[in-house]
Each structure stands twice: as structure tokens, then as C-alpha cells.
Swiss-Prot record:
Subunit structure: The complex is composed of two ATP-binding proteins (ThiQ), two transmembrane proteins (ThiP) and a solute-binding protein (ThiB).
SUPFAM superfamilies, per database record: P-loop containing nucleoside triphosphate hydrolases
Main location: membrane
UniProt name for this protein: Thiamine import ATP-binding protein ThiQ
Entry's Gene Ontology molecular function annotations: ABC-type thiamine transporter activity; ATP binding; ATP hydrolysis activity
Pfam families named in the record: ABC_tran (PF00005)
Annotated compartments: Cell inner membrane
EC supergroup of this enzyme: translocase
Originating species: Sodalis glossinidius (strain morsitans)
Domain (ABC transporter) ranges: 2-230
């Protein structure tokens, strides 16, 4: 599903290099210190950065230079980037057509997705009239409505309080299972990773320092847990 073979990106002439394989349907957390290269890894997959060298494969095809809109991925950021003057339905609809000219089938698809994330009764509201958790659900729905097999999340829930964050993690787990999505999620929260992703990548200094069970990091069983301040 996802393969990075010696994918290298230069940051101020310093190479960040990634080797990685993720099977279809896997849920993988990406942890590590600030500035280690976690977001860079996602941006290379999403197409916002172009590798200097190496091969990037997504869903069985090479995508080193494919524009973001033509890659089999959707990406959700910490900032939900909703348009304040558009309704919830219109913000979701942008995932289907930038001009919001939707077919009847697409309107049905939008409503089905909204129902799946619990927004079916909020479609006519503006973002300012809904909660922070509901705004993130709207942004997630906009990703899901595109029906891409790979979902990339860059600290999507860090601005939410613990209860809302746990609620969103549970929702995401259900959505991934229902849609059989392949998920990679950057986070600074090991608890979120433990609840959602059996596998974790620990990125340090532009390299994948650890690739293994999330539980081994949380328990301190792996020596790599020391990077996260966990006693081994």
C-alpha cells in the first residue's frame, strides 16, 4: 500500500531519509520530538514536498512527482481550515467539487458521510455555530468524502480537550474499520497512539529510529521509549 524506498528530502542541505512499508488497512502512529521530521514524512506522501531521491509508492503506483490532488490520499491537519462563510455541508462538499457543483449521487454521498461522523443534524450550520470537536468532524468528513484509501493526519486533535480527543480517536477507529482505510497519524500524545494504532514509528533527526509495537513504547519495554521520556 505505502512504500518509501530511501526517500530523501533535503532541509537546508541536511538529508531526511525514510525507508518504510505500510500494508493496506494498517493504522500507524508517528511520534517523535518537535522538528524531527514527522510532518515532513506525511508531506512527502501527500505531495506537498518532492523527494530529492528515492522511490515513493502509494496504492501500487509511483508518486514521486504526482500533484497532491491526484494522489490516493486525504490529509487532515491540526487546523481544520474550514471556511467561515460556508455551511457544514458546503465545507464537506468542497472535498467533492471545488465549485460545489455536486451531482445528486454526490449529495447522497455527502449526507452518508455526515451521518457516519455524527453531523447529519448540523449540515446547515456555520462553523462558528458548532463546537471545536464538531468542526474537526467536519474537516474529517471532507477528507472521507473523497473516498481515498489512505488517510494522513497531522496532529488533528491536539487542540481538543482530553474527552473530545478520546471521542475523536474512537470515531476514527470506527471509520477506518468500516472503510478499510490505511492510516498514518502524527501525534505528540502516546495515549492517542496506544488507543488507535498497534504500530508506531518514532522519528528522530530525520530518520525512523523505531518501528514496532506501540505497546512496547508505552510500557518502556523498548529502549526507544527513553526518547519519549518513558523509563525503560
Amino acid at each position: 500500500m505505502i512504500t518509501l524506498d530511501k526517500v530523501t528530502w533535503l532541509y537546508r542541505h541536511l538529508p531526511l531519509r525514510f525507508d518504510l512499508h505500510v500494508d493496506a488497512g494498517e493504522k500507524v502512529a508517528i511520534l517523535g520530538p518537535s522538528g524531527a521530521g514527522k510532518s515532513t514524512l506525511l508531506n512527502l506522501m501527500a505531495g506537498f514536498l518532492t523527494p530529492h531521491s528515492g522511490e515513493l509508492w502509494l496504492n501500487g503506483a509511483t508518486h514521486n512527482k504526482t500533484p497532491p490532488a491526484r494522489r490516493p490520499v486525504s490529509m487532515l491537519f491540526q487546523e481544520n481550515n474550514l471556511f467561515a462563510h460556508l455551511t457544514v455541508a458546503e465545507n464537506i462538499g468542497l472535498g467533492l467539487h471545488p465549485g460545489l457543483r455536486l451531482t445528486s449521487a454526490q449529495r447522497c454521498q455527502l449526507k452518508d458521510t455526515a451521518r457516519q461522523v455524527g453531523l447529519e443534524n448540523l449540515l446547515e450550520r456555520l462553523p462558528a455555530a458548532i463546537s471545536g470537536g464538531q468542526r474537526q468532524r467536519t474537516a474529517l468528513a471532507r477528507c472521507l468524502v473523497r473516498q481515498q484509501p489512505i488517510l494522513l493526519l497531522d496532529e488533528p486533535f491536539s487542540a481538543l480537550d482530553p474527552a473530545l480527543r478520546a471521542e475523536m480517536v474512537k470515531l476514527l477507529d470506527e471509520v477506518c474499520a468500516t472503510r478499510r482505510l490505511t492510516l498514518l497519524m502524527v501525534s505528540h500524545n502516546l495515549d492517542d497512539a496506544l488507543r488507535l494504532a498497534p504500530r508506531t514509528l518514532l522519528v528522530v533527526d530525520g530518520r525512523i529510529y523505531y518501528d514496532g509495537p506501540t505497546a512496547a513504547l508505552a510500557s518502556g519495554e523498548s529502549q526507544a521509549a527513553a526518547i519519549l521520556g518513558i523509563d525503560c
